[in-house]
Amino acid sequence: MKRLFEKVFGSESEREIKKIDKLADRVEALDEEYKKLSDQALQSKTAELKGRLSQGEALDDILPEAFATMREAAWRVLGMKHYRVQIYGAIILHQGRISEMKTGEGKTLMATLPVYLNALAGKGVHVVTVNDYLAQRDCEWMGKLYEFLGLSVGVIVHGITIEQRRAAYNADVTYGTNNEFGFDYLRDNMVIYQKDMVQREQNYAIVDEVDSILIDEARTPLIISGQGEKSTKLYHIVDQFVKTLKIEDDVSLDEKANSVTLTEDGGTKAEKAFGIENLADMNNMELSHHINQALKARNLMRLDKDYVVKDGEIIIVDDFTGRLMFGRRYSDGLHQAIEAKEGLQIQRESKTLATITFQNYFRMYRKLSGMTGTAKTEEDEFRAIYNMDVVEIPTNRVIVRDDQADGVYKGEQGKFEALAKDIEGRYKKGQPVLVGTISIEKSEELATLLKRKGIPCEVLNAKHHEREAEIVAQAGRKGIITIATNMAGRGTDIILGGNPEFLAKREMKKRGYADELIANATSHHETDDEELQAARKVYNDLLEKFKKETEQEHKDVIEAGGLHIIGTERHESRRIDNQLRGRAGRQGDPGSSKFYISLEDDLMRLFGGDKMLSIVEKMGLEDDEAIEHGMLSRSIENAQKKVEGRNFGIRKHVLQYDDVMNKQREVIYGERKKVLAGESLKDHVLNMARNIINEAVAIYTADAKYPEEWDLVGLGEYLAGIYMQRATLSFDNIEELTVETLQEQIYETSEKLYEAKEEEIEAERMRELERIIVLQVIDTKWMDHIDAMDQLRQGIGLRAIGQIDPVRAYQVEGFDMFNAMINSIQEDTVKYLFNVEPQAKVERKQVAKPIEASHGDGNRKKAPVVKEKEAGRNDPCPCGSGKKYKKCCGE
């Protein structure tokens, strides 16, 4: 029915494109007029358009003129002009939607149109990329356009200073990675002086490779950690124990669910080894947690796939890009467990100081849009979570790539032999081949096999990331075989026959030209600078030379069939497979793609089912014979759909939990901002005192009908324990009191006490003390609360056994814990400020110093902490803070 509807009325995307057709006409209609403008007249358009906005016009009103200005600037500065399809994509981005644009269609240039338009409002535009290289490259490349038109540009990459960050965020256009934007937001909400904040409000963001950032990485929270206090000895001891355990007998391993646990026998062995009666006992929670993480490190985390060992450190490999993630650590003790497994020095476990998911960070933007070559398969998720729909942008030229049927083999060895034979044949006729593997281990295994056959190849994986751009840019040259992990090199165009611009720049770099001079030498705008003119001549001469070389090579490669893509196994997501295929056939070039699959591949083994294997066994095929059966293709797609559905469920589940923390985070961070910006917090502190008084009075008068029956002695003792001297409380004419007059009487006494304290200390110093103490109390309590909520979340899953919705239970109990934290913040703040001594030296300092920014582990397992009975005063606090009840929520 859907297909019939689309045949008659066109697809949803085609209908959306028709709606913006006339707007694109208006942009192109200005082309001739803007060509005639001088550089100065074109540059003055920026001030003119800003003026129209200040007079009340909307961004939509000035869109045609803004787009036409940027199109002409792009031609003058870069020698590039936006195609009509890029105008379509740009309008979609401006509308806060996702433009699905195929590889090589010019997403980077397309984005300059909505970026320029939205930057005119003066509130900042963020262009988000997946790695530092692309952020730096795009900023230098496209930044020339914005600067030509009088806008400022900044870039946020790992390792720059606070001052550089602030300057970059204050620019009209800011390029950066998703990680840096997210971590800067968290760091801004940990500063102790407002001047140390770097970000502005989240206004408008365009997310490049939006599927990678908002879908693939959505399960993994960003975490800023401080140094923990726990000893690291237990990690080594537990690792030695776990090493002795046997799969099935002692350990239950479920690769499909990515989980590993002790069996009953394994639990008995653990109890015997560590001399305890019951591993599940709450007192053994820490040991149980260490064992779980050691099991995961030993059985689920694989060297050269999930991580590499470099210079005595564990470096995480990004699961989606295959890149090394320097400076990132697994949280929750998993990193330490891997260090123990590999026999490295163990660094202390960290304490979470601040955390947020990408989902909740990017949902803070007033307007959010994205671009990618593959998003349509995930449109339901984009709609459900981000309220963004996906519009497919037509290609500038028809795609002629030949996507061949999968080659399915019984075993992995047969598969590798077959694809090596395929590569050998293509190498001999000069056809370039890009091979996509899913791990470093597989890429190096294949490279070794090819070298044995005398086939030279370039290997691009996390171990060789420094040459990434160079390797990918030349992957379209004659007879070049490139092996790349997953989607490494994404964002760099593969041009058939080689990239003359890249070759010219590389030659200039060899000759000693500075990067900035090379970047300016590639532009076309007018200049009087003699050094730049000379560099431009050198660049143009080199460009002509390399164009001649690559032109003939381009023809040879096209004759050989264009770029051929080989996938060494199917990814969990169809979208990732499509991304790999999309590297070939750019801008109407010929090309082809083929996936080689074995029934031993993880996806097939875990989700393909035994049914497929039994069919193959009956066919009696040899290992190196390809299997062709309609059912196999359907099974592969069904396996991928199963995994995609499961992963969507996990991401949705993560978001349901993080939404609870997100509301709490907004309250705390909002409170911090008020404290940092406020001149005086006196009223705020007195209001806290009023809240304490009102609640205390309500409790100590609750069970009595008459004022004479109120527990005023208990009330006095309670308030004296917080901030008020017992002698200052006296009540006359008790029988005439009401709850309200009692509250007011105590508040007036409190106000006088605070005035006296202020007089004793001096008003100016009191204002600074208020800020220092409120910030320190908020930060201390919030960090403890993050830990407590994490403990609650790990244990809440058990509620499902009792027919209780775990998410609902988490919301209710999390709300109770948050209220307890707010009360605790109020009590501690009032206690410290009412009792501060004049000679006390109190300085503004961070409660805990961040030592690292890391990605959480999306599949963490932790021993459960379940709130059961009412705690005694000396019992551990049920909130999970680790303190005694009387020193925590029972204060």
Curated annotation (Swiss-Prot):
One Gene Ontology biological process: protein import
- Positions binding ATP in this chain are 86, 104-108, 493
A Pfam family in this protein? SEC-C
Q: Encoded by which gene?
A: secA1
Ranges of compositional bias, category Basic and acidic residues: 845-873
| GO molecular function term, any single one | ATP binding
Write out the residues that bind Zn(2+).
877, 879, 888-889
Query: EC annotation?
Result: 7.4.2.8
The protein, known as: Protein translocase subunit SecA 1
One of the record's GO cellular component terms: cell envelope Sec protein transport complex
Q: How is the cofactor bound?
A: May bind 1 zinc ion per subunit.
